[in-house]
Amino acid sequence: MLHIALLAAVLASQPMTAEAARSQIVSEEVTFVAGGRTIPGTLVHPELGTGPGLLLLAGSGPTDRDWNSPLLPGKNGSARLLAEALAARGVTVLRFDKAFSGKNPGLPIADLTLDTYRDEASAALDFLRSRAEVDPARVFVAGHSEGGIHATRLAESRGDRIRGVILISAPGRSLREILEVQLEKNILGSAKMTPEQVEAEMVPVRTALRSFVAGQDVDPKSASSNPQIVAILSALMSPMVARIGRELASFEPAQAAAGIAAPVLVMQGGKDVQVDPVEDAGRLVTARRSARKAVDYHLSPLADHVLKTEPRSLEEVRANLQLLTTAYNAPDRTLADDLVEALAKWIRDH
C-alpha cells in the first residue's frame, strides 16, 4: 500500500502525455436517480486507490456533460478533457447531462427551475460520495459558467457534504446586469451610434429587464426595435421559460458565494470574453474576503471561457467573437496546463 501511495505521489508530480494519462484511468458510464428521473453521467477515476472526488457541473443551455453543445460545432469538450486530466492526478470526477442536455430529456420545460438543477446535482453528489473510489469526506463541487450558480446553490443546501467549491469562468454579476452590459457594448456599440443614441436605446431595455425580474410580464418588442435585442430578450422572457429565466436574471452570485461555508477557489481565464476577470471573478473574490471566508484565486493568462489555450491577443479575440465560439471545441485545442495543475493542487491541499 505504501508503495502504491508513493508511486501515485511521484506520478502526480510529473508531467505526462495525454495518452499516458488515459492509460492510468478508468471511465464508466453511470446513472443515478433524481426526482424520479434517471440521469446519465460519466465517472472517471484512477485505476487504483481511494481519493478525493469532484462533481463537475456544466454551463447554460443544452451544454452536456462533456461541455459540448448542439449550438456549437465540435466534440472536443473541455469537461471530458478536464475530468481525464484530474483523474490522472488522483481525483475521481463525475459529470452528467443536466436537464435538457445530452441524453437527459428533462421534464416539461415550463416546470424547469433552478431547483431542478440543484436537485440533480444533489443526487449526483450522493452518488459520488457512495463510490468506493472516493473518500466521502473529501468531495468537491466545481461549476463552469452558469454551472457556478448551480454549484453555489448546491453548497447552500448541502454544505455539510462538500469539502470545497470551485467556481470556473463563473459570473459574479446577475444575468440581468450582464445582459445590460453585453447588449450595450456588443450590439449597440457595434452599430456606430453616438453615446447619446446608445443610452436612449438602452433606457427601455433596462426598464424591461428590471420589470421582468420584478415579476411583471414583458413584451420584448416593446423594449427595442433592434431584432438582435428582441431575440435575446425573447429567449429569456418567453412564457415557456420565463420562470427559470426570472430566477437566473435575479440571482446575485457574489452575494450567494459569500455565504458558502466551505473554502472557495475562483478560476478565470485571461482570454475569456464572456466572463470578466474584474466584474465577475473580482466580485466573487471580494465578496468572500469581505465576509472573511476562505478564498483563493487563479487567473490563467492564456485560457479562454472553456479553459482552452488561446494564443491570440484579447483584442484579436474580441474582434472576431464568432470565430472564437465556433472554435471552442475544435479537435486540436487543448486545456491550459496551468489551470489544470492549479485545480489539482488546490484539491490535494484541501
Give a label for each model feature.
Residues T17-G53:
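N-terminal cap/lid segment of alpha/beta-hydrolase-fold proteins
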Residues S78, D111-R131:
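Alpha/beta-hydrolase active-site loop
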Residues A123, F127-E133, A137-G189, M193-T194:
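Primarily recognizes the serine-hydrolase "nucleophile elbow" in alpha/beta-hydrolase
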Residues V273-E279:
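Conserved alpha/beta-hydrolase "acid-adjacent" motif
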Residues V306-L307, R312-H350:
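Catalytic active-site module of serine/aspartate enzymes centered on a nucleophile-bearing elbow/loop
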